[in-house]
């Protein structure tokens, strides 16, 4: 299967490029100063935070939720990111072109009620953003924009996972080698929480998400959640989808047309960072809030930017969940470091504010952790305008939330070593590509767990960047973060042997131990992997809320993947197959 997939990808690249299926022509060159001037011309906090349209993933029959089928399309249209910026051409999700939004509609599902979604592609023959045919990429023979949808954080069958090789163009005119069905099934059997859906096409994830193919997905269960007493209802329980973008003066979304090493990769660069920060599709919006508790489900949908979030009036975040799952008890945090694709579920009590306004600000360097500090533009996120009057508030933050299965590292049946590499061009020292365990996505799977088991993965980061590690299907938790000593010697050995055990990793992973933050000690689907450290994660291949097996065959084709969720890294080629076996 993998050999056929690899051959199919190669043929698509050769035939597609030969047939003229190329990235769009480059506009006149633009400088970073110009992009900053465009962003700087936009007055902050003049657009109200949008509430994205909601689509229910069930119908009520005799007082109970019942399964339904949805049809959601991907469309090209215009979107206003700011009052003073011309409308931008975007790719967006919706039930029609007229109702499609950036981000897409929030799908609200009921726990235990399956949902079927037919994803349809109505996108044009050519992409609105540049892409690079020299990285492994879905390139159809007859043009079109390949897409495929992944429900991030979902526990669902492999056929509904959105394999990078299961892409399709408009009208299913062409499909990838792993494509099997236009309709995906989401069991919604997992714990209530917030997920998000986004494009996952081979080599195009960074361009397709930058264009707007993303949206929120919330699983609810009133019987489980109502007793907690957390803020609820559309006004007081809000999804915040964060994304950085840069714009041309005409409103077009900027993406680089020239690569960091053009003679190797004409377009690819290791990270995309935008000057404007958007929340729910608006640049630096504001939200008027009452003096009471609010629940915010924060999702970082940026390509590469980390956010270190805090409120300028000193109010803390009370973290109640992360990455679709609740914590066992609330944790108070003055700031939140949110990696790419990571989510945090927090409560903010505005009744405790001594000011009438609070800015949500960002202090995370980019790239993280050793890049440049945020500036006056990308260091701001949004503003809360706080009512002077005291408001009625019946919500609370309980002392206890929800319990899931124990970490139980001793139950692990397998210990794996996962090593992150960055490869450099000898002439320039710039990165050319990134691999996990020195292998490509097209290479045979080496991570082959069995459903119902626990594994320990020792994730070793030999690159300069922090990487948000995402496993499809599985749920995991970091338990230890240990620094590497004599790292150069270890890197030298790994360059020769590519084997952590033979390179005596136990002798090197004895450095400083960094505590996992309390609000990250929960079951997650994204964990930050710090450079120069070995991070121990305990991985569960079953439902962590109940301890039960998956309610579907997780060993079916085309399997799953795990990858770095910095999209520019994932596309080139920091992604590997994850194949469960019987």
From Swiss-Prot:
On cofactor binding, the record's note says: Binds 4 Cu cations per monomer. The Cu cations are bound as 3 distinct Cu centers known as type 1 or blue, type 2 or normal, and type 3 or coupled binuclear.
Cofactor requirement: Cu cation
Q: What is this protein called?
A: Multicopper oxidase LPR1 homolog 1
* Keywords tagged on the record: Copper, Endoplasmic reticulum, Glycoprotein, Membrane, Metal-binding, Oxidoreductase, Signal
- In the UniProt record, which is one GO cellular component term? endoplasmic reticulum membrane
Where expressed (tissues)?
Answer: Highly expressed in roots, and at lower levels in basal stems and leaf blades.
What role is this protein assigned?
Multicopper oxidase that may play a role in the maintenance of inorganic phosphate homeostasis.
Question: Which residues does Cu cation 1 bind?
Answer: 150, 470
* Statement: the UniProt record of this protein carries the keyword Ribonucleoprotein: no
Native organism is Oryza sativa subsp. japonica
Question: Can you tell which superkingdom this protein's organism belongs to?
Answer: Eukaryota
Protein family: Belongs to the multicopper oxidase family.
- Record: residues binding Cu cation 4: 467, 564, 569, 574
Q: Which PROSITE patterns match?
A: MULTICOPPER_OXIDASE2
Q: How does it sit in the membrane?
A: Peripheral membrane protein
Signal peptide (UniProt feature, chain positions):
1-20
The record's section on InterPro entries has: Cu-oxidase-like_N (IPR011707), Cu-oxidase_2nd (IPR001117), Cu-oxidase_C (IPR011706), Cu_oxidase_Cu_BS (IPR002355), Cupredoxin (IPR008972), LPR1/LPR2 (IPR052152)
Q: Which GO molecular function, any one, fits this protein according to its record?
A: oxidoreductase activity
Q: Where does Cu cation 3 bind?
A: 200, 472, 563
**One Pfam family of this chain:** Cu-oxidase
Question: EC number(s) in its UniProt entry?
Answer: 1.-.-.-
